[in-house]
Amino acid sequence: VITGTTTTQSPQFDVDIREIRKHYDRLSIFYRLLWGEHIHHGYWENGEAIGRAQIRLMEKLAEKARIPCGATVLDIGCGLGGSVLWLAEEYDCRVTGLTISPVQAQMASRRARRKGLNNRVRFLVEDANAWLPQSETVDAIWIMESSEHFRDKPNFFERCTTALKPGGVLAICAWLRGKRSADAKGAKLVETIGRAMLSASLDTLDQYVDWIRQAGLIVATAEDITANVAPTWEYCSRMAQRWPMPWLTPLADRPTRQFLRSFPLMNEAYATGAMAFGLFVARKPSRVG
């Protein structure tokens, strides 16, 4: 269901970009140990294992976006490069991954070399909030759970439009503010999670649709897939209780402790409707004539 048209403005969380960089520099090894090759939600249909569910989410987004084989792709907020390498392997894409973290870029580049993909992928250290499109446009922009960190999303989507070729596609998976986020308890829960997860803001499905349309793109898909991805945080909460995590957590700094303790809150936010998870696909109009 594609909706939109909202005048509500989500609260902004006071997040320092330097803290986001420090977070990923410090915790990327932990992410790799906890989540595996892909540091994003899974998509469950039939009780899949976590690794298969994470691949299924990428498959779902790529299928909806109709990513063509051999496409040039820009992955903004690429993390450890899981999607970059998967797109190169499965679709023979040439992919550039942007990450704010030098540590993530180094880890991703090493993985690309081990897989023999360094001739088709590259990783650049760049803050998406300051990213500017280059003269060479791309077939697709891929954003897997990173837009939560972007301060000015309307402006960001305008830059995406500039970076896409005519007929190019924008493919996004994003954490969202849910329908029950307006009441006091839901709002507090969203704020606690947003700050712990270093989000600039958490916004609604309607806001994403409106901003993408205002940027000049045609929205093809805007789907709430919360029910399929929610088991992610049950898995993460269980992993956080396994040795040595209960012993290590008290030794961590305050932001890391807040991050780890937000795992069960994500379960609550999805269960109560305070938060949701969206999948979006939009296309740049083809050139006329």
Where are the regions a protein language model picked out?
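A short acidic, Gly/Pro-enriched loop at the edge of an enzyme's catalytic core
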Residues: 129-141
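N-terminal auxiliary segments of SAM/dcSAM-dependent transferases
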Residues: 1-33
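Conserved Class I S-adenosyl-L-methionine
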Residues: 221-289
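Conserved alpha-helix/loop element of class I SAM-dependent methyltransferases that forms part
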Residues: 37-38, 48-69
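Class I SAM-dependent methyltransferase SAM/SAH-binding core
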Residues: 74, 83-130
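A short glycine-rich, Lys/Arg-flanked "PGG" loop and its adjoining helix->strand segment in the class I
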Residues: 154-169
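Short, glycine-/aromatic-enriched active-site segment of Class I SAM-dependent methyltransferases
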Residues: 176-199
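Short alpha-helix
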Residues: 200-222
